[in-house]
C-alpha cells in the first residue's frame, strides 16, 4: 500500500471526512514522526513497532562493476523494530 492508497481507504472508511482532510492529517502525522527522528528521538506505535535512527560508520566499499575500492561516508539510517502484536498477527496460523 502506498500513501495515496492509505489516504483513499481512510477517506472511504470515514465519509464524514473529506479526502483533503485525511490527506492533511496523514501529512501532519508523517511530518511529526520525521521531525522526532530528525531530533534524535524515537517514534513508538504500540502494537505496531518503533522507528529510530541508527548511525552507520564510514567504511570502504567496492564498486561491483570494476572492483575498485570506494569510500562510503558515515550516515544515519532509519530503523524499524516491529512490535509483538504485529509479529503475532503476521505469523498467526489463521486461528484468528
Swiss-Prot record:
Any one Gene Ontology MF annotation carried by this entry is: DNA binding
GO terms for biological process, alphabetical: DNA recombination; regulation of DNA-templated transcription; regulation of translation
- Give yes or no: UniProt keyword Transcription: yes
Give UniProt keywords alphabetically: DNA recombination, DNA-binding, Transcription, Transcription regulation, Translation regulation
Give the domain of life.
Bacteria
Note the SMART domains from the entry: BHL
Provide the Gene Ontology terms for cellular component: chromosome; cytosol
Stored InterPro entries: Hist_DNA-bd, Histone-like_DNA-bd_CS, IHF-like_DNA-bd_dom_sf, IHF_beta
Read off the HAMAP family from this record. IHF_beta
What is the purpose of this protein?
Answer: This protein is one of the two subunits of integration host factor, a specific DNA-binding protein that functions in genetic recombination as well as in transcriptional and translational control.
Family (UniProt): Belongs to the bacterial histone-like protein family.
How does it associate, per the subunit comment? Answer: Heterodimer of an alpha and a beta chain.
Q: What is this protein called?
A: Integration host factor subunit beta
Say which species the protein is native to.
Caulobacter vibrioides (strain NA1000 / CB15N)
Amino acid at each position: 500500500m502506498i500513501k495515496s492508497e492509505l489516504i483513499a481507504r481512510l477517506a472511504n472508511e470515514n465519509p464524514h471526512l473529506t479526502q483533503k482532510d485525511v490527506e492533511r492529517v496523514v501529512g501532519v502525522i508523517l511530518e511529526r514522526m520525521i521531525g522526532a527522528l530528525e531530533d534524535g528521538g524515537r517514534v513508538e506505535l504500540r502494537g505496531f513497532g518503533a522507528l529510530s535512527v541508527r548511525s552507520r560508520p564510514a567504511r570502504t566499499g567496492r564498486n561491483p562493476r570494476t572492483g575498485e575500492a570506494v569510500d562510503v561516508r558515515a550516515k544515519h539510517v532509519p530503523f524499524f523494530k516491529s512490535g509483538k502484536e504485529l509479529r503475532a498477527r503476521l505469523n498467526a496460523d489463521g486461528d484468528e
